[in-house]
């Protein structure tokens, strides 16, 4: 965090130096799916050497998750990029980025908007991979999570709709919001995220969207065992890790 002098913000460990939350998912049939496109996307794309994109999934309309859309031009200039969002996010796109979606300005990225409806059981495919939108709540704001094949991706969340939570059963890997150790009005705490991990029991889970209040990356797993061993079995705690920038994760399908 700018101006902060805490041990995390001044850490030299690259695991503690995080840009805004996003993910690039490569499927077995070589489709590259981007989840969210925040204002750090250009730098993230250069670091990761992203050559192509086949689809964009958007969780919600907050600045840190979508204000990099204009930087998609190199990946969506010649070939339109399918873009998936819920009704609320779609309305924001048509209003805030009307020069992309309504009155196309010359040279803008060609984003083809598809509005999905979790309440109607919408499921769609990107290549051979099935994607299921999951209704979540960021405080009071309805947002989307996604099941992408055997991967669950849930960010900025305080609740997963009871109708949709079972749709995540059977996943191999879970990436889930866990802002800090103490509770927050619009994000899961570590203990709250662990409740979801315990319900789903994936092979591996990664906490994302952490603030500097989470503490040093190197201390996380020890602290997790110390603070939550009376609430959750150690075998479950051992499957949980902090995500970090440029991390590559193998998902077993």
What spans do the regions from the language model cover?
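Binuclear metal-dependent hydrolase catalytic cores
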Residues: 1-154, 158, 219-253
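Binuclear metal-ion centers of metallo-dependent hydrolases, dominated by the metallo-beta-lactamase
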Residues: 161-253
């Amino acid at each position: 965090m700018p101006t902060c002098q805490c041990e995390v913000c001044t850490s030299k460990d690259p695991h503690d130096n995080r840009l805004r939350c996003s993910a690039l998912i490569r499927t077995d049939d070589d489709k590259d799916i981007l989840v969210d496109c925040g204002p750090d996307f250009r730098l993230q794309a250069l670091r990761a050497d992203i050559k192509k994109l086949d689809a964009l999934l958007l969780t919600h309309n907050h600045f840190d998750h979508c204000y990099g859309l204009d930087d998609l031009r190199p990946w969506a200039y010649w070939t339109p990029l399918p873009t998936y969002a819920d009704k609320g996010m779609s309305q924001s796109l048509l209003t805030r980025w009307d020069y992309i979606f309504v009155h196309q300005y010359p040279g803008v990225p060609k984003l083809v908007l598809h509005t999905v409806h979790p309440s109607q059981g919408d499921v769609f495919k990107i290549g051979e991979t099935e994607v299921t939108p999951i209704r979540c709540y960021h405080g009071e704001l309805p947002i989307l999570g996604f099941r992408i094949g055997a991967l669950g991706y849930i960010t900025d969340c305080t609740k997963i709709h009871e109708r949709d939570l079972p749709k995540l059963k059977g996943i191999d890997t879970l990436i889930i919001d866990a802002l800090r150790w103490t509770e927050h009005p619009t994000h899961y705490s570590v203990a709250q995220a662990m409740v979801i991990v315990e319900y789903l029991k994936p092979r591996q889970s990664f906490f994302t969207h952490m603030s500097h209040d989470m503490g040093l990356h190197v201390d996380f797993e020890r602290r997790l065992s110390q603070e939550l061993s009376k609430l959750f079995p150690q075998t479950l705690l051992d499957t949980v890790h902090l995500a970090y920038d440029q991390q590559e994760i193998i998902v077993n399908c």
